[in-house]
From Swiss-Prot:
Subunit structure comment from the entry: Part of the 50S ribosomal subunit. Contacts protein L29, and trigger factor when it is bound to the ribosome.
Protein name (Swiss-Prot/TrEMBL): Large ribosomal subunit protein uL23
Keyword field: Ribonucleoprotein, Ribosomal protein, RNA-binding, rRNA-binding
Superkingdom, natural source: Bacteria
Family: Belongs to the universal ribosomal protein uL23 family.
GO molecular function: rRNA binding; structural constituent of ribosome
GO cellular component: ribonucleoprotein complex; ribosome
Xref: Pfam families: Ribosomal_L23
Role: One of the early assembly proteins it binds 23S rRNA. One of the proteins that surrounds the polypeptide exit tunnel on the outside of the ribosome. Forms the main docking site for trigger factor binding to the ribosome.
GO biological process: translation
NCBIfam families for this protein: PRK05738.1-1 (NF004358), PRK05738.1-3 (NF004359), PRK05738.2-4 (NF004363), PRK05738.3-2 (NF004366)
Amino acid sequence: MIREERLLKVLKAPHISEKSTMVAEKLNTIVFKVATDATKAEIKAAVEKLFEVKVEAVRTLNVVGKTKRTGSRMGRRSDWKKAYVTLVEGQDIDFVGGAAE
């Protein structure tokens, strides 16, 4: 059993992009930014507990931070982890709460 305080630290934010919106509409999949040390089992448990939905599958990938230039200095953005969470048919997560009326 995964501790509740760990589950609250696993999910950081939903990742909103053109691709994530398209995947959400077609495949009933939600994209999250997650902790870099999070496992698929932890991500599944966190989504099911926090949003009260059933998760069918979880796919993860590590996003490598890009090197960026600021004036004459070179910097690097942080690496982060992305999770594609596929929900069971008929399940849905509403982030805006009916604001688009």
